[in-house]
Amino acid sequence: MPVKSTKTKGGSTQGGSQAGGPSTLKVNKARVPAKGKKDDDDATEAGEHGGEEWMQTKSLIKPDDQLELNDQELKEEFTRILTANNPHAPQNIVRYSFKDCSFKQTSHVDQLAIHFSLDGNMIHKDSDEARRQQQRHGASEAISEQAISEAGEEKKEEDGEQKTEEPKEGEKRDEESTPAPAEAKSDQKLTNQFNFSERASQTYNNPYRERGTQTEPPPRANFSSTANQWEIYDAYMEDLEKQEKAKEKKAAPSKKDDDKSKKKLTALETQSDDMSRISHAAKIIERMVNQNTFDDVSQDFKYYEDMSDEFRDQEGTLLPLWKFSYDKSKRLAVTSVCWNPKYKDLFAVAHGSYDFMKQSRGMILFYTLKNPSFPEFVYPTDSGVMCIDIRPEHPYLICVGYCDGSVGVFNVTSTDANPVFQSTAKTGKHTDPVWQVAWQKDDLDNNLNFFSVSSDGRVVAWTLVKNELTYTDVIQLQLDSAPQDGPEGTQLTPLGCGTCFDFHKQTDYLFLVGTEEGKIHKCSKAYSSQFLDTFEAHHMAVYKVMWNHFHPKIFISCSADWSVKIWDHTYRNGPMFTFDLGSAVGDVAWAPYSSTVFAAVTADGKVHVFDLNLNKYEPICEQAVVQKKKTKLTHITFNPNFPIVLVGDDRGYVSSLKLSPNLRKVPKDKKGAALNHGPEAEIAKMDKLLALVREPPKDNKS
């Protein structure tokens, strides 16, 4: 008999046979001790041999060209750095920038590398799609069972009609054909819906088959017509009439109250529409009346040229044209004048007060040369407006600076007279009046931004983000004096008072800042704690600094110390030209048509026009343009297209003056032919003048 042996936990061996019997048990008992002894002997031998193998040394098998290293080389550590950069990612992607009209390299490259991606086709059993599949599967099973049952019944009917000779065999067949009683279905094991694994396999793709059919093409027709403004208008009006007739047919009869309310609403709507139409028509009629009233002035603006300039070689005149004023702004000084960069006949005027002991309201007015009698837009403000600037890319956006230290942005296209953005004490407004604001290029996120300078010693960059203004301090105008002792032993660094600034036309990061101490600081947007250079320019407050439109190194400044100075920011030995005008100079401006022509206004009511190419010492035009003696001129600006200037005074009036031919003379050669006119020619003309006044470099003696 076969013997079955098992080993217990204690190490003993038990035996047993498949068929029980005393003889069999005896045989097993006799065999057990012998087998156990043999196993013990085998274990002892295995233990001895295993110990010997453990004690024996094993020789390493290595190839002949194996590199042998000493202990120092083996202990040397190598640093392995794992990075998330994709080695196959391209490093030299170049894209075309439509904004800058040039190709630019893309610095940020996507480092994502996908090694394997598989979209699973498993769905949750409780989802809607799973329920729909179960319903479809159950319906198909029911249909198949019904078909099987119908086939069985038909077979039974046929067997009943036929006479069978062997009923027993028929009974057997019926018994065989009848299905067995369905057993109770066991509970189906449900899978864990949160623990599953996806499997994939390669299957044979079904070949594509092309099928085609012939159909009749849709009918086509050629038609042509002309489309212009009045035909489009007529078509819209016909469609509107059809819609109104359809509404009248569908409208049910209403009560008297509803009729009254509808009549009131329609009356209000028609009244508002009529007012808008009347206002537009009234504006056109007003311009027509002004054109007839000021026809002589319009003719002078367009065609008049002073013929007496032919007899005066180095002298010119200013022809007064229109005078702009508004009844509610007569007692407010003109604090800023700015031409619209898109609409050449439109300009903005800011009104405020330079008497800071009696601060009152302010006002922003928009005038046009087509209607000098009344402003186009009026924006009253609670605080005096000290400066204004219009964005070149969006001529409907105007940034302003107030006397209370806040800044704001107006949208001319909006019907609301309030600013769309305005800074508050929570958003970092200035603590002193804002003297100048200027739009700059969009930041890296394409957000609009502008800069402002104030008497609190801060130059701030304002960014328009969604519905709020965010500020960033660009630089603080710290003085060279030692820190002063503050309360509780603190040290206070005195700050200068900024009065004006101007950004370079070509170098985006470079700008100048003028102060009340008479200094001009050359600053950079990249350095917020250090000046690039400082010019000891004037003895009193600097009222204006402005870069030349053509020469990248030249800028001009004016001050309350009666002087106007022209500087080269790379020349440290002093100004290139200095002019004493005999009165406080309120504003100065370069001409947009020449690099050597500039104009300045003084507190005695005079306009001074200089052309360095004709006379380097005296103005070629000095003319009083105010009617009252005590009227002070505050600002002046050139029109970029027409030969006129705008001059504002402290009584709220803005005067337009036309330059005579001698004030905008084109340089000619010895034969009388006009020289090349362009940026390079203007730069060369200015360099020729600067070469005469620059000190020659000193030779270093070795």
From Swiss-Prot:
The keyword Metal-binding does not apply. Transmembrane segments: none annotated. One of its GO terms (biological process) is cilium movement. It is found in: Cytoplasm, Cytoskeleton, Cilium axoneme. It comes from the Eukaryota. SUPFAM superfamilies: WD40 repeat-like. One of its GO terms (molecular function) is dynein light chain binding. WD repeats lie at residues 380-420, 429-472, 490-533, 537-577, 580-620, 628-667. GO terms for cellular component: microtubule; outer dynein arm. SMART domains: WD40. Keywords: Cell projection, Cilium, Cytoplasm, Cytoskeleton, Dynein, Microtubule, Motor protein, Repeat, WD repeat. Residues 36-52, 152-176, 243-261 have a biased composition (Basic and acidic residues). Residues 189-206 have a biased composition (Polar residues). Residues 1-64, 128-226, 243-272 are annotated as: Disordered. Coiled coil: none annotated. InterPro entries: Dynein_IC (IPR050687), WD40/YVTN_repeat-like_dom_sf (IPR015943), WD40_repeat_dom_sf (IPR036322), WD40_rpt (IPR001680). Belongs to the dynein intermediate chain family. Consists of at least two heavy chains (alpha and beta), three intermediate chains and several light chains. Microtubule-binding protein that may be involved in dynein outer arm assembly on the axoneme. This is Dynein intermediate chain 2, ciliary.
